[in-house]
Amino acid sequence: MSFLDDNNACGQNLLNIVSVGNSIIAEILRLKDYVPSIYRLDNKADKAKYGELILDFSYFKIAEDHERRIEQSPELTELDDEARAQLPLITRFYLAFQSIHHYASDLQQYIEELNTGYYIQQTLETVLQEEEGRQLLCESLYLFGVILLMVDFHIPGDVRERLLIAYYRYSGGDATPSGDESNIHDVCLLLRSTGYVHPSIAAKVLGLGGKQAGARAASLVVPRYPEAYFSRFRFDENFVDLVVARLRCDDIYNQLNLYPHPAHRSTALSTQAAMLYVCLYFCPQVLHSQGSQMREIVDKFFCDNWTISVYMGMTVNLVDAWLDFKAARSAIENVISPPAIKALCQQQKEQLGKITQKTQEIVREGVLNDNFVLEHANKIIHLMRQSNVLLRWFCLHTSREVFIFAHTATLTGQVQKCVLHELQFNRNTLYNLLLNCSQMELSVREFLAEIQQTKEERWTKSREEAMQRLNELSEAFAGSRPLSKIEQNPQLQQWFGEVAGRLQKLELSRPQKSGRLIIQVMQALDDVQEYHNLHSNMLVKQQLQETRDMLNQMAQLINLKEDIEIHIQMITDFSYAWHLLQFDFTPPMQEHIKRQPQAVIGIRAVFLKLASTLEVPLMRINQARSEDLVSVSNYYSTELANFLRRVLQIVPETMFSILAKIIYLLTNVIKEFPTKVEKERLKDYAQFEERAKVAQLTNSIAVFTKGILMMKTTLVGVIELDPKQLLEDGIRKELVNHLANAYNLGLIFTPEKGKTPVQLLQQKLQALAKTIEGYRRSFEYIEDYLRVQGLRILLEESQRIINYNVEKECNAFLRNKVQEFQSEHQSQIIPIPNFPPLLGDPSNNFIGRLAHEILRCTDPKQTIFLDLKSTWYEKKAPHQEVLAGSGFFEILREALAPAGMVGLERLYAHMLADELKRNLERLQRNLTSDRMWVDTLAALTRELEARDFPTPEVSKQPLKYYQAYTQRWLKVWPTLLDWVLCIGQKQLLRREIAGELSFSSKCDAKLLENTADTLNKALLLELSLSKDLCDEKGVVMLTELQETLLYTGNFEPLEQVFLITKNTHNMALFMFLFTIAHLGRMQHSTITDCLLPKSAKDNIDNVPFIVGLVTILQQFHKNVKMLYISYMSQYVVTVSEAQLLDKEILGPEVVTALHFLLAFIRIARLPLGVLEQRIPNIILSEYEYLSTLLK
């Protein structure tokens, strides 16, 4: 029974453990990009905001005090709730950390089971005697070491501690989501911070300099690393010793058979060498003191190389890694001595020139075909082996290692400088070898695959043709076939007939017998030709040569083994370049494409070479038939596909640099043809030279397009990449970068001398509109040459950028924030760039800056809004126009498109919701809890609702009566007024945005606007009659329709309800008192026919004041609004009666109140009948006459 048979529990359990190890590594690599920024605390803003809340393991010492501090601080409580919202993501991190500990525990348990005889007839020694068992046992220990290194490299120790503490605090730490008991204590002990610093952070620290440079450099040194880290989990010593011994002495993967040349020994054992390197950290005494063993290891595995790939391109330099290990350091120093390096580099340099030339000759067009591959298969594989060995050595030893242990050590750098100097290294030479090697491998694989598929057919065809020629010769020597000058020869007739008969019996399924017979026949043909002097007749000689060719082809087909492709796969391993290719070869690739767009064909071969390495992490997962296969293969394939996109991004980048020139010419130089033009003026629009320049630039773009489209559809892992889609994605990505940059730079509002904020705002918007129009015209012009739908792409991407930035800006008002990876507008393939906020600016991005700038320009404290003209004016005389609503919002739409208008509206809506929530909660709390408020309002309610109100005392001086109540909140009114005006201002802006969207949609998208409006009315009618639309499908449809209605401006901002409130009549009464307390600060203007502040210095503005009140009351039941109007009407009637009885004339208080009420019901869209029911008609209709003094 095989070790990996399904019935062999011992083998299957070990295979599953190793499979899980590979899956854990993929999960760590996947999660490293999703660490929430607040747990990194790598900038001052996050440290200041979350530093007190998010702690590392120091939390355990002050847990109770920490929790008490959070409970006592509302700010910390709110931040804690915000951080708690990320628990699902934190849980995934914890499960990944826990799986690391589970992996080690499962492996330890498996070893114990082997030692205790749990598996029948299986012990540690017998498993190591099995080929598969030996490989898997070594891999199991090696993978745990790789996991530890990977997690420490990609997720820093302090970040791990903060994530573990967050999980402990927010989940309780007692159980995992699956219901298993949590072992968080063991996980914390294993993954606590080691002190290791990532190379990128270490480089920044070392680059700072200054007085404390020495101290900072010392902080980067981690003693006994990674020895102490690996010792946190103890495995059975015998198991570790046996694994290290097998790795040291055996060829566990039988690689030496594939690399027979002694110079290739270190490459043959490279995978085993990496495993041995990791496993030695589990028995550090060998590294420290076993000098003879270390010399043996170095002589066998590292005699000509000192940089190794540990796992999927995670490279390590042994000079750096073994610096703190005496025996290991001593052993490796022999390899890196200057004479040894010089000799080795000289040899490799010579080989590089020879192999590059050979591969160049092979990949030259017209050389490689199926017959060439069939004939020279062994020579080609030998060349592949040589070129890959050379490629591996140069890639690893001319690049900086990925994992750096000693950041302050100088020896590593000295060795690399020496190598580069001796090699006189040129990266482009190595790049050419890589290209040749990749193209050769791809072509040979394709030909071999084709040959293997048609092998039976080729064999049969060759045999039939050989038999046919032999039969023809037999007939010719019989005299029945009249070939010129051939004498009849019965013996040759019989012999050729017998040979043809023997060939008939050949079978491809019996290669040894058939091969021997073919060789015998070929030898016999040579002997016959020589003996009978048949070469004197050219026709016979030609027949015999063609027969030999057919037989030779049959022999080649027999010799072509089925496992040849597996051998090629193994000798062309490129997994060591997973990281190096991105760091070192991206610039040469992009420069190559820039010079020759058709170079993408060769670069495709490079990526297919790299894609073949996905077998390394997937092999064991696939063998175990694990469910993780899809997710792991998808991760690596996505990473590789994204890398290919990054390399090919040079094509869109170059296109856009050319397109920028076209944009300039089309926008600023070339005149747009009018619909009609006079014949005499036609020359003015010709502009031959400028149009020739545009044509030349357009041709350059077309060449790049053609180049990338020459690349075939490519399967990268499990992801298929279509060149047309790659081109479109690249164009989208570059367009997104340009548009995002244009929005970001175009909407920075720095004060300029001689310009008001409004002038600067309009100027910026007009400039931005011109830029966007330039892109529109250019894409409209160029889309046919790019073979994409340019205008659709421009519309979709600009809309996505705006929606993404609106979402980010709105996050400030959300407790459960939308994370970067959760955003439906963000994309891994076409990412929207993030720009840092401006210093001292409360906004997060350009949409927030624009929203705040518009608010600044329309501040009710500085401006007056005239509703009839939709225009803002200065409060100070001479009341100049500040911002004309119709003209300004048209400019805004041209600059940001409808998507930007809708985005602004959404942002203002979020601001309103946040302000209403905070202030209404506080207001309602006071209305229900504050003794003075409750008692005063209760007393006033009883008096106002009494049957005998107004009493004689009130009737004499009603204003004094009301004033007595309003003065009780004198300290509250200023704050409340600012809030109401702020709400009114934002609602006014939302209303103006809706108006502009409605107007533009009626002009530019009349059919859409009409259709959406009709559907909306139909659905409203349907909802009023039944609840059929309240199911899931109905809600989805209503949501989609709401989105369309926003874009067509078919919505009423003042009717929107932002939050759920408790209804109370006290709210109506309080808002009534607030209103009458401020009416005296306004007066009616006959010029503008509206209320204006009496003083230019007064902060109040009538329309925002009313709109703010309407919005607040809209959050309650409509009865609250009606009650508010009733109180206001009662106030008007009461004061009117008193004034008419006293002076027979209405005072300004009543007139102002009536103008206010009429404006209120108009803005609130209420019928006039609401007032007619509450105020006598004589007052309502004749108040202007009744307030006029008669002479």
From Swiss-Prot:
Superkingdom as given in the UniProt entry: Eukaryota
Localization of this protein: Early endosome
Keywords associated with the record: Endosome, Protein transport, Transport
GO CC annotations, alphabetized: early endosome; endosome; nucleoplasm; WASH complex
Record-stated family: Belongs to the strumpellin family.
Residues spanning the membrane: none
Organism (species): Drosophila melanogaster (Fruit fly)
Subunit structure: Component of the WASH complex.
Function as written in the Swiss-Prot or TrEMBL entry: Acts at least in part as component of the WASH complex which may regulate wash nucleation-promoting factor (NPF) activity and is required for its membrane targeting during endosomal sorting. During embryogenesis, not involved in the wash-dependent developmental migration of hemocytes anteriorly from the tail.
Name by which UniProt lists this protein: WASH complex subunit homolog 5
The keyword Transport belongs to this UniProt entry's keyword annotation: yes
